[in-house]
Amino acid sequence: DSDSAQNLIG
């Protein structure tokens, strides 16, 4: 989802 670690880092 949009709150996943990779999205937050990206």
Curated annotation (Swiss-Prot):
Protein name per UniProt: [Gln6]-mosact
Organism: Clypeaster japonicus (Sand dollar)
Protein function: Stimulates sperm respiration and motility.
Source taxon at top rank: Eukaryota
